[in-house]
């Protein structure tokens, strides 16, 4: 508060000066009136002199504080408060002088009837104001008209909370909250961004400053290499980025030619890789060069590269010490209000392990950074598991859920959970320019390559592989000494470099799935090299209800095959989804593949350029820190009614569309549903993942009572779910056709 001391002292000194001046002036007036009765000075003239002095003071004060957001709710000791104080002081002085003049006039003339310029009229001027001086002294605030709250679904609830809790932390009063609805509204619109800004309010200078720095695309990796060199944990990712550097540079240049990448705000972004911290107990970085899982490292390296090339300021953390150093300004801040001033970060990319570390490190300040989080989450987190109390009521004991974030803040490896956002990765092309020329000359052999580098994946698959072996050679890339489950006719190449694997795939006609691992990147790499993928069908579908692998994961998603993305979004002739236990079905697929000629195919979303486009759109358009959700645009909305027993994900998919959860809020009022020919004879609010829904017999609508429970997953047994679907760009399913 030291910053405001000069204003406070200045106003006190001026007040003292005015009181003294008024007293001396009054005495002089008395003396002058008695001595010079023939030329009485007008009280209005004297009043004008005092007002002129006050105007000069106010003008100087305004100049000193021109960068302060001023107004009736701007906080304590602002120019507005000083003006009100001065107004009260002047009014008091003028009233006293008016009484003094009246007494003098009575004393000299014996009556006040002939006084035409008496200041007794001054109080009537005050009465013309919206609020009287006495009201201001008693703390009454000016009324303000609240704007419409459409598009700000949380605003009303936040105002109700503030009415009960605004005294729980003195920081609210520091921001000008005084118990009135208008002060709540201004705080929630300008400090925490849950409500629309009042049109007459000036913009916060910090917000204005935020838009001064623009992002410029980068076309070299020097700064990023230097940044990542400090961490041995980043070695595998660093090597991947170096291998793909030329492709990335070409991609960012190509994207800049296709769409306008200028006038984008350069954002401060924290990237915290919890899985790579020593405290996590995982050894992903250590096993990366010896056959360990690479999916997370692939996704992280591609994300970091994209953020960097798009021109944002990134800071990378892979230890608790680094995290604390970056966030030290707010660590320990127990205030219920956000930290004032320049922001440390504006976006935070993190994983589930890092999420727990981040919350523990920040303590109470955590709540102010929740909306900035983007959580890398390969298998996804459905709303049912994300909502803490709802998950508890359903008996879910997963250690990965209950974060109470907007479900779209979870970023997945594939677009399998529409409630989440699809981040994806890049399918690497390991070849240099001379390789590319040579690879096109490679002739396809009558051979297949099995997708499974661990011996245990091959268990109980011999009959299935025998069918394939009847028609072609079977090759493998299994590592390790154990090969007991591998048939003797298989030609095992062991672990291959990325380059050698590409050449092997170019010689191969069929890439053979064994049913595990689920949803890996390898099938996409095979398809990109011209192989057909034999995709094992799961009947019944696999989920946490019947498969140990999914137990504990925060999703009830059902996998209909080893690779649902390839099944749904690619399909034939590149992907053949078959029942491994149906000999005829397998044989028919193998014969068809041998008789067809297919070209290499790579979905745009798994290229460098596709990922850059998608991440840029998310950074520019996705905003969970402000109440109004305007993206994707409403022009993309297509409303569908699901049949009982059918989820929104299913009904949208049947119509070649995607379920878009951000549109649910536009289908949660009776008047909104009328626009889409859904007429509610009656309605009620209910907190459940299966609503909004419609019961056609009675035309009864059930609307959502908790915004975090909007869900594309889940089927109602008797009601029709009211589903928000949207179109998508072929090869870029995360974006609608009007999204760019």
Swiss-Prot record:
- Lumenal topological domain residue ranges: 31-740
EC number in record: 2.4.1.155
Give the intrachain disulfide bonds. 144-182, 155-195, 171-337, 371-625, 648-723, 652-725, 659-712, 680-701, 736-739
Provide the reaction this enzyme catalyses: N(4)-{beta-D-GlcNAc-(1->2)-[beta-D-GlcNAc-(1->4)]-alpha-D-Man-(1->3)-[beta-D-GlcNAc-(1->2)-alpha-D-Man-(1->6)]-beta-D-Man-(1->4)-beta-D-GlcNAc-(1->4)-beta-D-GlcNAc}-L-asparaginyl-[protein] + UDP-N-acetyl-alpha-D-glucosamine = N(4)-{beta-D-GlcNAc-(1->2)-[beta-D-GlcNAc-(1->4)]-alpha-D-Man-(1->3)-[beta-D-GlcNAc-(1->2)-[beta-D-GlcNAc-(1->6)]-alpha-D-Man-(1->6)]-beta-D-Man-(1->4)-beta-D-GlcNAc-(1->4)-beta-D-GlcNAc}-L-asparaginyl-[protein] + UDP + H(+)
Residues of this chain annotated as glycosylated in UniProt: 109, 114, 117, 333, 432, 446
Which segments does the entry list as coiled coil? none
Stretches that traverse the bilayer: 14-30
| A Pfam family the protein falls into | MGT5A_N
Describe its membrane topology: Single-pass type II membrane protein
Give the protein's recorded name: Alpha-1,6-mannosylglycoprotein 6-beta-N-acetylglucosaminyltransferase A
What organism does the record attribute this protein to? Cricetulus griseus (Chinese hamster)
Q: Which gene encodes it?
A: MGAT5
């Amino acid at each position: 508060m030291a910053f405001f001391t000069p204003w406070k002292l200045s106003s006190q000194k001026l007040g003292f000066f005015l009181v003294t001046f008024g007293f001396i002036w009054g005495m002089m007036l008395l003396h002058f009136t008695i001595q010079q009765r023939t030329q009485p000075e007008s009280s209005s003239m004297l009043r004008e002199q005092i007002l002129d002095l006050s105007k000069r003071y106010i003008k100087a004060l305004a100049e000193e504080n021109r960068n302060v957001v001023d107004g009736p709710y701007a906080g304590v000791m602002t120019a507005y408060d000083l003006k009100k104080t001065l107004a009260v002081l002047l009014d008091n002085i003028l009233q006293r002088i008016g009484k003094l003049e009246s007494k003098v006039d009575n004393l000299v003339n014996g009556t006040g009837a002939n006084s035409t310029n008496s200041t007794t009229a001054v109080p009537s001027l005050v009465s013309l104001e919206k609020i009287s001086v006495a009201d201001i002294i008693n703390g009454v605030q000016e009324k303000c008209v609240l704007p419409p709250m459409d598009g700000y679904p949380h605003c009303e609830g936040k105002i109700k909370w503030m009415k009960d809790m605004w005294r729980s932390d003195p920081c609210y009063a520091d921001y000008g909250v005084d118990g009135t609805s208008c002060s709540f509204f201004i705080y929630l619109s300008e400090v925490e961004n849950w409500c629309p800004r009042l049109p007459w309010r000036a913009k916060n200078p910090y917000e204005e400053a935020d838009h001064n720095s623009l992002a410029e695309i980068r076309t070299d990796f020097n700064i990023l290499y230097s940044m990542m060199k400090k961490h041995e944990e980043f070695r595998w990712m660093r090597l991947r980025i170096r291998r793909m550097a030329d492709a990335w540079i070409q991609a960012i240049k190509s994207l800049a030619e296709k769409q306008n990448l200028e006038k984008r705000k350069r954002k401060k972004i924290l990237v915290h890789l919890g899985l790579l911290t020593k405290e996590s107990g995982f050894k992903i970085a250590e096993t990366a060069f010896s056959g360990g899982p690479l999916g997370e490292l692939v996704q992280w390296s591609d994300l970091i590269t994209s953020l960097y090339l798009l021109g944002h300021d990134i800071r990378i953390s892979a230890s608790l010490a680094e995290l604390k150093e970056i966030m030290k300004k707010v660590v320990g801040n127990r205030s219920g209000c956000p930290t004032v001033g320049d922001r440390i970060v504006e976006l935070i990319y993190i994983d589930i392990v890092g999420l727990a570390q981040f919350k523990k490190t920040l303590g109470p300040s955590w709540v102010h950074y929740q909306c900035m989080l983007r959580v890398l989450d390969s298998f996804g987190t459905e709303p049912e598991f994300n909502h803490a109390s709802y998950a508890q009521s359903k008996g879910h004991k997963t250690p990965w859920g209950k974060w109470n974030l907007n479900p779209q803040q979870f970023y997945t490896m594939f677009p399998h959970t529409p409630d989440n956002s699809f981040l994806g990765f890049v399918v690497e092309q390991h070849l240099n320019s001379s390789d590319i020329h040579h690879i096109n000359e490679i002739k396809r052999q009558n051979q297949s390559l099995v997708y499974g580098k661990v011996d245990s994946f091959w268990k109980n698959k011999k009959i299935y592989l025998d069918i394939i072996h009847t028609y072609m050679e079977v090759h493998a890339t299994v590592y390790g000494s154990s090969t007991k489950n591998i048939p003797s006719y298989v030609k095992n190449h062991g672990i291959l470099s990325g380059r050698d694997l590409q050449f092997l795939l170019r010689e191969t006609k069929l890439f053979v799935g064994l049913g595990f691992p689920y949803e890996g990147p390898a099938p996409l790499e095979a398809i990109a090299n011209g192989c057909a993928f034999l995709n094992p069908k799961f009947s019944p579908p696999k989920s946490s209800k019947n498969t140990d692998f999914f137990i504990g994961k925060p999703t009830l998603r059902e996998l209909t095959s080893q690779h649902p993305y390839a099944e749904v979004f690619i399909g034939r002739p590149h992907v053949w989804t078959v029942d491994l236990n149906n000999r005829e079905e397998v044989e028919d697929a193998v014969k068809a593949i041998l008789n067809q000629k297919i070209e290499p195919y790579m979905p745009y979303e798994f290229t460098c350029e596709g990922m850059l486009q998608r991440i840029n759109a998310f950074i520019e358009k996705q905003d969970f820190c402000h109440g109004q959700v305007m993206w994707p645009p409403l022009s993309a909305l297509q409303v569908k009614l699901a049949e009982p027993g059918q989820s929104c994900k299913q009904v949208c998919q049947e119509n070649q569309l995607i379920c878009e959860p951000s549109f649910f809020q536009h289908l949660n009022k009776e008047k909104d549903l009328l626009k889409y020919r859904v007429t509610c004879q009656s309605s009620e609010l209910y907190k459940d993942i299966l609503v909004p829904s419609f019961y056609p017999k009675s035309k009864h609508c059930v609307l959502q009572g908790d915004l975090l429970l909007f869900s594309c997953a889940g089927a109602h047994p008797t009601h029709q779910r009211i589903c928000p679907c949207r179109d998508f760009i072929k090869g870029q399913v995360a974006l609608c056709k009007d999204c760019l």
